[in-house]
A protein has these predicted regions:
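Asp-based, Mg2+/Mn2+-dependent phosphohydrolase catalytic module
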Residues: 22-24, 121, 125, 141-142, ...
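Boundary at the C-terminal end of the N-terminal hydrophobic targeting segment
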Residues: 16-18
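A metal-dependent, Asp-based hydrolase signature
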Residues: 67-105
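Short, acidic loop-to-helix structural element flanking the phosphoryl-transfer center
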Residues: 80-81, 100-136, 146
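Active-site neighborhood of HAD-like aspartate-dependent phosphohydrolases
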Residues: 20-64
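An amphipathic alpha-helix signature
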Residues: 42, 56-60, 80, 84-88, ...
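Positively charged n-region of N-terminal signal peptides that target proteins for export
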Residues: 1-4
Length: 244
């Protein structure tokens, strides 16, 4: 009995899927920070904020916060628009002079030119070769994510691209995950979300999906939410886990 318990603990630590957990048919991917490296924007955002490198994370969290304000007030704006507005807010609250044109220049072009993390292409290729349907599910606009994938060389890996622009509800609104499931023609049990954000994992799990947290630098899980099925450091690591 002790041996069996020990094996179960080992499997759990390795992220090995339980036998009664169905293999996902569709894998949804968050985009910004999960697949694409936001650090490349640091120089333009830092310059716009008067050299304040420490305000980069505040800007991104402010952008996410106000996307949820749009959900609540039902006044949808694109992620790029919210990003510009959030940068202006952070600048004003820290007494940095910044015009709307300067904020847009610091965000829009760099956001559409983010490079993929080093592990991404190999991981996506392995998952695609294993037969999984790969779909991006992003808070970015339809045109925005298309341009991002073109510039990052990721277009060919995905079977489809879904944007919250079509439902006008930002993640982690449960309706967004439910809409994605209906659009993909699968049940929650047949789908998995991969994300580097605790709030996205929380939303996916609450909607009934399987979830994998990819631990990008500085990213942590929300401890009060349902736990992800897996926690990995790279996409090839996830591909190995799912290759049962």
């Amino acid at each position: 009995m002790r041996f069996i318990m020990a094996l179960m603990l080992v499997f759990a630590s390795l992220g090995v899927q339980a036998k009664d957990t169905p293999q996902p048919e569709v894998i949804f991917f968050d985009v910004n920070e999960t697949l694409l490296d936001l650090n490349s924007m640091r120089s333009s955002v830092t310059e716009a904020l008067g050299g304040r490198d420490d305000l980069m994370s505040l800007w991104f969290s402010t952008m996410l916060h106000h996307s949820l304000v749009d959900n609540t007030t039902r006044r949808f704006h694109t992620f790029g628009e919210i990003g510009v507005a959030s940068l202006l807010m952070v600048a004003e609250s820290n007494e940095v002079e910044l015009s709307e044109a300067e904020a847009r220049q610091a965000i829009v072009t760099p956001l559409r030119s983010l490079p993929p993390h080093p592990d991404v292409k190999a991981g996506l290729q392995a998952l695609k070769e294993a037969g999984f349907t790969l779909i991006s599910l992003t808070n970015s606009s339809n045109q925005g994510v298309k341009t991002q994938f073109e510039n990052a060389g990721l277009l060919s890996y995905f079977d489809a691209r879904y944007s919250v622009e079509d439902i006008q509800r930002y993640k982690p609104d449960l309706r967004t995950y439910q809409w994605a499931l209906e659009k993909a023609g699968v049940t929650a049990e047949e789908a998995m979300l991969v994300a580097a954000h605790g709030w996205d994992i929380a939303g996916a799990k609450a909607a009934g999906l399987q979830a994998t947290f990819i631990a990008r630098e500085g990213k942590v899980l929300y401890p009060l939410a349902l736990k992800p099925d897996y926690k990995v450091n790279t996409l090839p690591e996830l591909a190995k886990i799912l290759a049962r």
